[in-house]
Curated annotation (Swiss-Prot):
Name of the encoding gene: 54
Pfam families named among the record's database cross-references: Metallophos (PF00149)
Annotated GO MF terms: hydrolase activity
TM stretches of this protein: none
Protein name: Gene 54 protein
Length: 255
């Protein structure tokens, strides 16, 4: 019996594309996959960002309301339609409140656990697991957000995941880049071969809300990923969101 895993990335709430996120949650409810993995940057948390240090945004007091938005728009709707395993990688944006406390308020570090994203978002209450930095998501595959492990980031789709695959020596699925792409590589000799795969799953962020782009259009692609697992057979698949819709197995979901 095959197993299906839905992998989503970089919602960066409150800068998520609300219609896309709602449609993907609906897809999960309709198809009931065996596992859901959010590969990181569930949250953006702009106020404690190093990019807003010294600006009015630093004093906006958004951490709590932004966390409540994530519960209202993602975690609660997801749990209303799906009771299977949900795991979340910690992305670089997710840990901004925790890092800010350590860097700028060391006298309060004893309270640091309260600023971890899993506590701000009540993962225990929603039955959500924090995944290890490198998670064995399927036979011969690991998932990781993509910002650690010495991975070199590039501006071309799939190339960052490809760099991770070569560095780690295993098939890899990542987020972080906001791009979609799949890129394999074959090693071997004398007709014997070993094929590894690298995959970047895209994002569910509203690019118009990314103020740091300053009106530019980034090389980002909206969508998510799927892994279909049957024993040691693993099929990676991208699901792009284009023209207000996406399709899986011949069925179409409207955004």
């Amino acid at each position: 019996m095959s197993k299906r895993i839905v992998v989503i990335s970089d919602t960066q709430i409150p800068f998520d594309d609300r219609k896309q996120l709602k449609a993907v949650v609906g897809f999960i409810g309709d198809t009931q996959p065996d596992e859901v993995v959010h590969i990181g940057d569930l949250m953006d948390y702009p106020s404690p960002s190093r990019w807003t240090k010294g600006s009015s945004e630093e004093f906006a007091q958004r951490i709590k309301p932004d966390s409540e938005q994530a519960k209202t728009r993602f975690l609660a709707p997801l749990r209303a339609v799906y009771d299977g395993p949900v795991g979340v990688h910690e992305g670089n944006h997710d840990r901004r409140p925790f890092d800010y406390l350590h860097k700028f308020a060391p006298a309060l570090v004893e309270y640091a656990d309260q600023f971890k994203f899993e506590n701000l978002l009540d993962f225990d209450g929603f039955g959500v697991t924090v995944l290890p930095e490198f998670y064995k998501v399927a036979p011969g595959w690991i998932s990781t957000h993509g910002h650690r492990g010495g991975v070199r980031v590039t501006q071309k789709s799939a190339d960052t995941a490809y760099n991770a695959m070569q560095r780690f020596g295993t098939s890899v699925i990542i987020g972080h880049t906001h791009r979609q792409g799949i890129k394999p590589h074959t090693w071997g000799y004398g007709g014997h071969q070993k094929v590894l795969w690298s995959m970047e799953v895209g994002n569910l962020m509203n690019m118009k809300l990314a103020q740091y782009l300053k009106g530019a259009t980034a090389n980002w692609q909206s969508g998510f990923g799927l892994l279909t697992v049957d024993g040691n057979h693993v099929k990676p698949e991208l699901v792009p969101i284009v023209g207000g819709r996406f399709s899986v197995d011949g069925h179409v979901w409207e955004v």
